[in-house]
Amino acid sequence: MSYDVIVIGSGIGGLTTAGLLARAAGKRVLVLERHTEPGGLTHAFRRDGASWDVGVHYIGQVAPGSQGRAYFDYLSGGELEWNRMPDSYDRFVYPGVDLRVSSDPVRYEHDLIAAFPDEARAIHRYFKDVRRVTRWVTLGFIQGMVPRPAASMLRAAQRLSGRTATSTTKEYLDTHVRSPELKAVLASQWGDYGLPPSRSAFAVHALIVSHYLQGGWFPRGGSARIARTFEKGIEQAGGAVRVAQEVTEILTENGTAVGVRVSDHRGAQVHERVYRAPVIVSAIGASNTFNRLLPTSGEIGRRTGPARRTLERLGAGTSAVTVFLRLRHDPRSIGIDGGNIWVNRSLDHEGAQRYSDSLLEGHPHNVFVSFPSLKSGESPHTAELISFCEEKAFRQWAGHPRGHRGPEYSALKERIARGMLELAESAAPGLTELVDYVETSTPLTYKHYTAHPAGAFYGPPATPLRYRSRPLGPRTAVPSLFLSGQDAGSTGIMGAMMGGVAAACQVLGPRGYPTIASALRTPPTAVHSPGGHSLPEGKHRAVLVSKRRLTPSVWEVVLQLDSRIGPWTPGQFARLHVGDNAWRDYSIAGLEDARLRLLISTRTGGRGSHFIESADEGARTVVELPLGGFRLADSGRRRLFIATGTGLAPMLAMFAQAPDLENDTLLFGCRHQEEDLTARISSPMPGTVVRCLSREEAPGSFHGRVTQAVTDLAHDLRLDPDSTDVYLCGSAAMVTDAQRVLEHEGYTSVLTEPY
């Protein structure tokens, strides 16, 4: 299949470029994403029914009638809906200071003056300068959207008024503000652009402050809907968003970009593919583009040299540790209304190295507290805690694969998470008691999933040097190659989106900006069904052939696909469309002659549960498969399988093909005998099966959790940590607990698939 444009990366920038080219110009666009989930930092991940939005915490300037809303409405076909956050969308907490930020900028200014009456003049000037500098930054954005002659004129106009914009935030505050408390309060949102006041340009500070002056908004149903609604317009125009596609090289001929080389991770084996198109857009960052995907020597290296040197001078940005919390109850029960909380131990925002060290010791200096479920309207309820740090603090584990970094790394994450939760508790009393499950990501996690150098998810740091330098922008020195996203625009969701707009404008040439501006004025057109047009490779129409209730909360589901799929491997999963722009992942229990067998739990009561409970035989949907990297290792070692609930599903597929199954062991956990799937499914099983019942005693079963069985039965089962591969699948809490036990017992080969 031929495409007009290839976009590398499916973050908000890449999808904006692809969506505009598809909807406004009818281009067939192929979007390639290395992760198994589209959306970049707008994607969400799920654990046992709960979901967290990894990179979207609030978005400003999307009120009805705003320019930002116009872009989202157009690209989503009007299907993306929004929830407004509380009036006090941000709260700044310091020793002796607790200030709530109103969505009314006039009221916010008055509240600041009431709190700091001696600084009234400085506060008035501050808001005036924020608006003035924001206009200066906007001129920079527009340069990337218009033809070169017009951009040169705008650049000249920008030079006349850039002194304040290119000072540091600290320099500005020290010059105009006397009160240490007010300086700290005004700089509180530096986490939204990733640099403390001494390093950040006042330009980016003003841009972010201005962005939120009218309050915060959040996508109804979660940020994953951004990618899913944008994707439909891309597919309707004949394009595709393909996941598990790692671009390893941008191909050039005679100095011009002509295609990409890809490692395709979807099937049974990783294999190389080449895609060609007249236009290539990279939305994975300038550094990855110029230093990794293109030659750094020869003619291409010479052309990209200035951009690479600029990136080297700018250095690396900031990363973070994020703690994801599932809550037992609605956080409104402890007085939380859905606004964000910025908690600080002192007025000092500086000392990155010192604060990174204290974070590792379990004493964070600051923490950002967010409640995604209250913003999205989803349940179960969730919270997120974020503290900024540098990647080098975790560098000693960088060479180890994800999930195999050992007990010291796990203990470090637990210590950090406890410290962050303690600090959050100081501003949100009662939060700790609500916590039901904890998962922690580090800069290594961000680096793994986004490929950003050092896990710096904001891209090149927004220092004064970045704003004094010639902007990277969407144009490159390589013909037919463009940049999109944050590096072509600015930090954050809206900054990356504007980078995507700029790239689309440049791809379309001199008439690009007028074409897109005209398209935005047309009413958005929804694509009501993901199967209402020809489907891209990897997606299949499916019909529900049968469903059978195996236990009170688990269904066995069989779907007939419209065609056979290519090679797959046991352990992989399928992604099922469950309606309303929502997709859910289910491990493949079996796949033969285009018949897909799944085990689906309805225990969480979410969208997937409602879909399968209400679907009748003959119901139609769309399935994407195969995906995922959970698979049997070809090691020849003994295997120990540990599963709870529908975590048995991928193992059923493994059992059907595993050699020497009689030498293997399965520990299957459930609460009662009526939930024992091993007794209700006709399938090959390992030679030793231990049924672990946590709430009932029964003959021939182990009474206790699977984590207890690992230690209590190790001798009887002759389990040797040094010669055993462990496969672990089930609820996220069980996987976390079992992994901790296995690490303590000395197991080093542990493959996990948390649900």
Each model region followed by its residue ranges:
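C-terminal segments that line or cap access tunnels to active or ligand-binding sites in enzymes
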Residues: 330-441
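Mid-domain catalytic core of redox enzymes
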Residues: 218, 248-378
